[in-house]
Swiss-Prot record:
Domain of life (superkingdom): Bacteria
Protein name per UniProt: Large ribosomal subunit protein bL27
Annotated family: Belongs to the bacterial ribosomal protein bL27 family.
Keyword Hydrolase annotated: no
Cited PANTHER family: LARGE RIBOSOMAL SUBUNIT PROTEIN BL27M, RIBOSOMAL PROTEIN L27
Entry-linked Gene3D superfamilies: 2.40.50.100
Record keywords: Ribonucleoprotein, Ribosomal protein
A single Gene Ontology CC term: cytosolic large ribosomal subunit
InterPro entries: Ribosomal_bL27, Ribosomal_bL27_CS
GO terms of molecular function: structural constituent of ribosome
Transmembrane segments: none
Biological processes annotated in GO: translation
Database matches in NCBIfam families: L27
Length: 86
């Protein structure tokens, strides 16, 4: 006779792949035009000077330069800009 009962089954054991969201280039770091600065869902960080926004709300540099983060307005919204290289 078998020494073990059947293993049964479970409804657990699944998880989605991580989406690798977040800041990719931090304040003060150099970036090339087209380089991704932030990957995000929604506009947690807003686009400032020389920063474009993709259809998935990804922020990217429009010019070569250095990344600069700031907090703007009464609502204290975070904004990222690119200061052009001299």
């Amino acid at each position: 006779m078998a020494q073990k009962k059947g293993g049964g089954s479970t409804r657990n054991g699944r998880d989605s792949e991580s989406k690798r969201l977040g800041v990719k280039v931090f304040g003060g770091q150099a970036i090339n035009a087209g380089g991704i600065i932030v990957r995000q869902r929604g506009t947690r960080v807003h686009a400032g000077e020389n920063v474009g926004i993709g259809k998935d709300h990804t922020l990217f540099a429009l010019v070569d330069g250095h990344v600069q983060f700031a907090v703007k307005g009464a609502a204290k919204k975070q904004q990222v800009s690119v200061v052009p290289a001299a």
